[in-house]
Amino acid sequence: MAKTRTSSLRNRRQLKTAVAATADDDKDGIFMVLLSCFKIFVCFAIVLITAVAWGLIMVLLLPWPYMRIRLGNLYGHIIGGLVIWLYGIPIEIQGSEHTKKRAIYISNHASPIDAFFVMWLAPIGTVGVAKKEVIWYPLLGQLYTLAHHIRIDRSNPAAAIQSMKEAVRVITEKNLSLIMFPEGTRSGDGRLLPFKKGFVHLALQSHLPIVPMILTGTHLAWRKGTFRVRPVPITVKYLPPINTDDWTVDKIDDYVKMIHDIYVRNLPASQKPLGSTNRSK
């Protein structure tokens, strides 16, 4: 009962923060808007300059893919942490003890800033999973590929399955973890979207546990389609690993729903899918 009451109080505080941030959208003066744009410009300038230098290092290390992965994680820790610090965003991290072992880390995706959190917090020896078209993203796509992260071909089911088999082979041979956004795209309003099945297929083949990584408030710190970054409190919460050793192919839909429901229960009302509030209590 006490745990439920604490969760309810936390959700109310987060909802108040969401309402306040929405109201602030109409109050921002020109100075705050320009300051926010300036911060974004500075951050992207830093990313651009360092990405070029890091890309050259990655080219030199082409014969050593595992070293590229580890150094790519190090680059992400430095740049991701620097960007978060420059934005001045207050952060609370919970459950970091659940990141000590190999796993498939999954995260909800509601803001452009989520990518920097993933870069900053991914354990050393972790590869990202993205659609194969990421290689065409200017500079960062090429850096992603050079860092030996995994690209999934989603053009048809057969290609996707083959891509996932290759992903499992890589992480098994190199003793790596995975990190990915199971929604497959970014939410427009911060509310949780349906999950794709890819992360479950990867868990079935690799037998790695799944560690949910729940981001709360990022959609208020940097809203999709805007150039305004706000110092809104953000919580990063890791849940205990979910064992997948006894999972079977015939229950894939059940596993997807189970983990999606875990997110619904742990997100504040402002980030739950519409119509899910009562079901998640």
Curated annotation (Swiss-Prot):
Subcellular location: Membrane
Biological-process GO terms, alphabetical: CDP-diacylglycerol biosynthetic process; phosphatidic acid biosynthetic process
Pfam family, one: Acyltransferase
Regions crossing the membrane: 40-60, 71-91, 110-130
Membrane topology of this protein: Multi-pass membrane protein
Domain of life: Eukaryota
GO molecular function: 1-acylglycerol-3-phosphate O-acyltransferase activity
SMART domains listed in its UniProt record: PlsC
UniProt-listed Enzyme Commission number(s): 2.3.1.51
UniProt main location, coarse: membrane
Annotated motif HXXXXD motif, positions: 109-114
Pathway per the UniProt entry: Phospholipid metabolism; CDP-diacylglycerol biosynthesis; CDP-diacylglycerol from sn-glycerol 3-phosphate: step 2/3
Family: Belongs to the 1-acyl-sn-glycerol-3-phosphate acyltransferase family.
UniProt function note: Converts lysophosphatidic acid (LPA) into phosphatidic acid by incorporating acyl moiety at the 2 position. This enzyme uses erucoyl-CoA as an acyl donor.
Protein name per UniProt: 1-acyl-sn-glycerol-3-phosphate acyltransferase
